[in-house]
Amino acid sequence: YMPYAMSVILSRAIPEIDGLKPSHRKLLYTMYNMGLLTGGTIKSANIVGRTMQLNPHGDASIYDTMVRLSRGNETLLYPYVESKGNFGKAYSKNMMYAASRYTEAKLAPICNELFGDINKDTVDFVDNYDNTMKEPRLLPVTFPSVLCNVTTGIAVGMASSIASFNIKEVCETTIALMKNEEHVISDTLIAPDFVGGGYIIYDKAVSYTHLRAHET
């Protein structure tokens, strides 16, 4: 039981300190290696096929991951994938997306902050599932990305549910805490910032969420 539980926690369901689950990281790193930080978009099916060298869980799950990370799907406050074609719309009646052979994608400009120092020995590299390639254990992000995009995950014995926050407020709060560990977080990190907007009904609950961890 314990090996299975740890595998799910560390290798599948819970985001790491770089804000990414393994499936996200494998996709984005593959796109980076394909040179998709610059230039135009390419067929999503091409990207999915290449990603299977790092992620053996099948093309459907890889494409689902790409859709969720895309600007067109409108799931993330700061999308990592620029999309072309029908990627569906999260939180709407039109959630269905076109097949990967009909859509195109590339990395969004914010991914420069994910990969800028990756070739400077800033992170460890590990073997992929069949020991034929190397992949980064983490990405050398330059901002607290784990707090900037909404992330949910259900593992074994624990769960993760992190709201998205404004990147400027997150960075200001991080700097303030580095200078003064007694800094009041709610002074600079006002409230979550959701893609679809929202209203704060009970403001005292906001400060509570800053300190609360959830276990199942």
Q: At which residue positions do the language-model features occur?
A:
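Conserved small/polar residues in nucleotide/adenosyl-binding loops
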Residues: 209-216
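Catalytic phosphate-handling regions of large nucleic-acid enzymes and associated NTPases
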Residues: 1-205
